[in-house]
Amino acid sequence: MHTPLSEEIAQTTARLVVEEGLEWGPAKRRALRQMGLPARTPLPDNDQVEEAVREYIQLFCADTQPRELRALRQLALVWMDRMVAFRPHLAGAVWHGTATRLSDIYLQLFCDDPKSAEIALIDHHVDYEPRTVTGFHGESVEALSLGSKSPELNEMIGVHLLIYDLDDLRGALKPDSKGRTPRGDITAVRRLLQETTTP
């Protein structure tokens, strides 16, 4: 339920997401602290936060964000091409169009053998850090995190390769609560890049 308080929390969260590159969960919790609210205060849902992020970008970042988003999508495509054998799908802010230069890239890989993506990185002498993250069904998922230089932005960007079982691909493309595809394959990302032009 959208209340004036939840809208204010969402707006503060949006500022933290856009200006500091925080993930939504930590940004919501920090917003509560900054606003002096109790930790048990009901948080806005992700749809409300996404709406606030889009509004914040339109108001404060309209001149820079489209170019930054395009650069992140181009870098995502580079890694999707490198990891094409693992059926990569782009997800998160870079896919949904709310990313800025502070956003990381999240690629979901769907593998027959979960270790095969890690072996591919080792074979190509890519430094990465393995860790465990929460997957799209709330389960624990192995992630391979690395830094990659964006030539357009001239800075290092975090790239996270989330390793899923091949069987997970079937349910991965179900529309979200707004009817949107929650992730896109190489063809979809190429199409996004063709549809958008740098101002």
Language-model features and meaning:
Residues T3-G21, K28-R101, C111-P199:
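Catalytic core of pol beta-like nucleotidyltransferases
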